[in-house]
């Protein structure tokens, strides 16, 4: 199982898809990745359709002061030039699914190819997606072209909801053979490190 610090970062020079059916675990995760990367001095661009203050508030779970290397660009809309806005070492596009809803498969392929080209030159992309928003063929295209795919899952177990992270694939990393249990606290998203018995 990955160590706690390993899932808080994505590999450099990569395009990584973070997806979830319904919920906010992916948001907690991307806020943590952005805050930690900016805290390490990386230039982070967070391109979003959500209010910038909501994004910054989410990141404050992980750092008291948001570094100057973090730029939140809100008001993004479908059809915007996503690649043109994505400068810096790490670009987070939230929500990639809603911002790409009007793209046909050729446009989507062109956009993802451009991201991969930029990634090979040193930039990383984190694409945040709500499953089921894009047509199934488009969702599968994004998964196929991404260097990594992380999926968040919530399951009902008895009278509780258990949250998990699945790393479906990640360039340069051996396949993970376990799902990673998570908890959400006042401090944000945390790996549940308690060993399960039985």
Predicted regions and their residues:
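Phosphate-binding/switch region of NTP-binding enzymes
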Residues: 133-188
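Conserved P-loop
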Residues: 12-79
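Short gly/ser/thr-rich secondary-structure transition/capping motifs
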Residues: 1-2, 75, 129-133
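Short, well-ordered beta-strand core segments
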Residues: 16, 44, 125, 149-151
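P-loop NTPase motor core
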Residues: 83-145, 149
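Conserved, well-folded catalytic cores of nucleic-acid-processing
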Residues: 36-40, 58-65, 99-102, 115-118, ...
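Pre-Walker A adenine-sensing motif
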Residues: 1-9
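Short, charged, intrinsically disordered terminal tails
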Residues: 193-198
């Amino acid at each position: 199982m990955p160590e706690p610090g390993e899932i808080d970062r994505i590999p450099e020079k990569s395009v990584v898809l973070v997806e979830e059916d319904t919920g906010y675990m992916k948001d907690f995760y991307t806020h943590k990745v952005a805050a930690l990367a900016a805290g390490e001095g990386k230039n982070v661009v967070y391109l979003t359709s959500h209010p910038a203050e909501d994004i910054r508030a989410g990141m404050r779970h992980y750092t008291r002061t948001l570094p100057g290397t973090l730029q939140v660009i809100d008001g993004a809309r479908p059809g915007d030039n996503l690649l043109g806005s994505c400068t810096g070492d790490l670009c987070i596009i939230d929500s990639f699914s809603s911002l790409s809803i009007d793209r046909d498969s050729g446009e989507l392929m062109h956009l993802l190819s451009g991201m991969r080209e930029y990634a090979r030159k040193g930039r990383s992309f984190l694409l945040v997606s709500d499953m089921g928003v894009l047509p199934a063929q488009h969702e599968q295209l994004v998964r196929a072209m991404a260097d990594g795919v992380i999926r968040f899952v919530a399951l009902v177990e008895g009278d509780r909801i258990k949250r998990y992270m699945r790393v479906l694939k990640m360039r340069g990393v051996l396949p993970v053979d376990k799902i990673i249990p998570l908890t959400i606290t006042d401090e944000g998203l945390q790996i549940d490190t308690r060993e399960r018995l039985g």
